[in-house]
Amino acid sequence: MLILTRRVGETLMIGDDVSVTVLGVKGNQVRIGVNAPRDVSVHREEIYDRIRHEKEGGPEDKGNSE
């Protein structure tokens, strides 16, 4: 894992098309902004895991979500 230090307002680049900017820090929360092409999905990890689980689980999981 690459570990980088950035201050509020500073940006890091991932490849040529994705930028991540630190927008603010309040306590133990960090607000970041991500600029990426529309064909690149950007999700919080817990949302990504839920999407992946729903895709793997198939239609039977849909009834449990309501």
UniProtKB/Swiss-Prot annotation:
Its main location: cytoplasm. It is found in: Cytoplasm. GO terms for cellular component: cytosol. Keywords: Activator, Cytoplasm, Repressor, RNA-binding, Translation regulation. GO terms for biological process: mRNA catabolic process; negative regulation of translational initiation; positive regulation of translational initiation; regulation of carbohydrate metabolic process. InterPro entries: CsrA, CsrA_sf. It comes from the Bacteria. Gene3D superfamilies: Translational regulator CsrA. The keyword Cell division does not apply. GO terms for molecular function: mRNA 5'-UTR binding. SUPFAM superfamilies: CsrA-like. A key translational regulator that binds mRNA to regulate translation initiation and/or mRNA stability. Mediates global changes in gene expression, shifting from rapid growth to stress survival by linking envelope stress, the stringent response and the catabolite repression systems. Usually binds in the 5'-UTR; binding at or near the Shine-Dalgarno sequence prevents ribosome-binding, repressing translation, binding elsewhere in the 5'-UTR can activate translation and/or stabilize the mRNA. Its function is antagonized by small RNA(s). Belongs to the CsrA/RsmA family. Homodimer; the beta-strands of each monomer intercalate to form a hydrophobic core, while the alpha-helices form wings that extend away from the core. This is Translational regulator CsrA. It comes from Alkalilimnicola ehrlichii (strain ATCC BAA-1101 / DSM 17681 / MLHE-1).
